[in-house]
A protein has these predicted regions:
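Short beta->alpha linker loops
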Residues: 7-8, 122
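Glycine-rich phosphate-binding active-site loops on the catalytic face of alpha/beta enzymes
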Residues: 9-12, 21-44
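Conserved, mostly hydrophobic/aromatic
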Residues: 16, 51
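N-terminal beta-strand motif that seeds the catalytic metal site of vicinal oxygen chelate
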Residues: 52-77, 111-118
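Core segments of cupin and vicinal oxygen chelate
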Residues: 64-103, 125-128, 132, 143-150
């Protein structure tokens, strides 16, 4: 495994981290020497936090809506699709609306109201960094394929929604 430190910046950090051989990146783009000399720790912290946020690439994946049964799911999917002029794709356990922005569950799934999927560039790195921010994970929900974590749920709901990283 390698740690790259030369030529890395906010625009290309994820290109480096996309290689299995690269375990970490670093460099002066995250912590300028003049900031260290000046003791500008708040600025250094902000730059480092920005670097981590860029690396994680967290963004909304989809919203899952729990329905009581298949009939309610079909009606809900049709309503959302008609309202937003989106396509419907029926699956085994759910119905997707749009480009998978909405997942309408055919029976109640995780979360009181449903679930929210958060996309990330690397689930394992996101588990570590979000854990540092106080997020607890349901380790029993961890889904691993080819040695990499591909999904995991937060331990706690937020506003009646289960959250998971994918």
């Amino acid at each position: 495994k390698w740690m790259c430190t030369g030529g890395v910046n906010a625009k290309n950090v994820n290109n480096y981290l996309g290689y299995n051989q690269i375990i970490a990146v670093g460099g002066t783009w995250m912590c300028k020497s003049d900031k260290i000399k000046a003791g500008a720790w708040d600025e250094i912290t902000a730059m480092s936090r920005e670097a981590v946020d860029v690396m994680l690439g967290l963004e909304l994946g989809h919203i899952g809506i729990n329905c009581a049964d298949e009939a309610e799911a079909a009606k809900t999917a049709e309503t959302i699709a008609n309202l937003l002029s989106m396509a419907v794709k029926v699956g085994n356990s759910s119905i997707f609306v749009g480009k998978k922005e909405f997942e309408i569950m055919k029976k109640p799934g995780r979360g009181t109201n449903g679930h929210i999927a958060i996309l990330t560039n690397n689930v394992d790195r996101a588990i570590y960094h979000l854990g540092q921010r106080g997020v607890k994970f349901d380790m029993d929900s961890k889904n691993v394929k080819d040695g990499k974590t591909v999904a995991i749920y937060f331990a706690d709901e937020i506003a009646g929604f289960a959250f998971h990283l994918v």
